Amino acid sequence: MNVDSTGLDATVLVTGASRGIGKAIALRAAQDGFDVVVHCRNRLNEAESVAEQVRAQGRQARVLAFDIAGREAPAAALTADVEAHGAYYGVVCNAGIARDTAFPAMTGEEWDSVVHTNLDAFYNVLNPLVMPMVRRRKPGRIVTLSSVSGLVGNRGQTNYSAAKPGIIGGTKAQGLELAKPGITLN
């Protein structure tokens, strides 16, 4: 979607945007006319490089660094950013991890890190952002990335395959809750 057709001055947060799919999404958002908040956990140099590439396209960009697996850090960083810059037009929940291991050999840490990063992050990132987006009284967009593993499972990915359907279900439920104020989720 090209932001010029909406008439909005729009900012989009992309989680996990320092490399890979998240980087590509951030750059495409800039190409489409959005300002971008580039999120990373700890790859600050790569995230700043993405932000520079966004700025080179004539858009504004800033970097936020926090671990989406925890509750406090995302809430603090996102609340402060919204207070300083205003509510986002959109959010792309892209960040995630895999720790592939056969279930009998899977450690509790491997289970927890994947579930907290992939599933809990849905809440940790979106909860501080939804009401500011609603209060804008303008359309908004939230996109969550999941995996076919969330529908059919995958050998060696019990933790990953358990987390991904939660994202799908959470997205559908939030889509119903946020439809009336004009915020769509996919």
Task: Give residue ranges: language-model regions.
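Residue(s) in the substrate-gating loop at a strand-loop-helix junction
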Residues: 147
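Active-site helix of classical SDR
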Residues: 126, 163, 171
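Conserved glycine-rich cofactor-binding loop
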Residues: 18-19
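Active-site loop immediately N-terminal to the catalytic Tyr-X3-Lys motif
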Residues: 104, 152-158, 180-181
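Alpha-helical segment proximal to the catalytic Tyr-Lys
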Residues: 131, 176-180
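Substrate-binding pocket helix/loop in short-chain dehydrogenase/reductase
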Residues: 102-103, 107-115
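Conserved glycine-rich Rossmann-like NAD(P)H-binding loop of the short-chain dehydrogenase/reductase
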Residues: 34-48
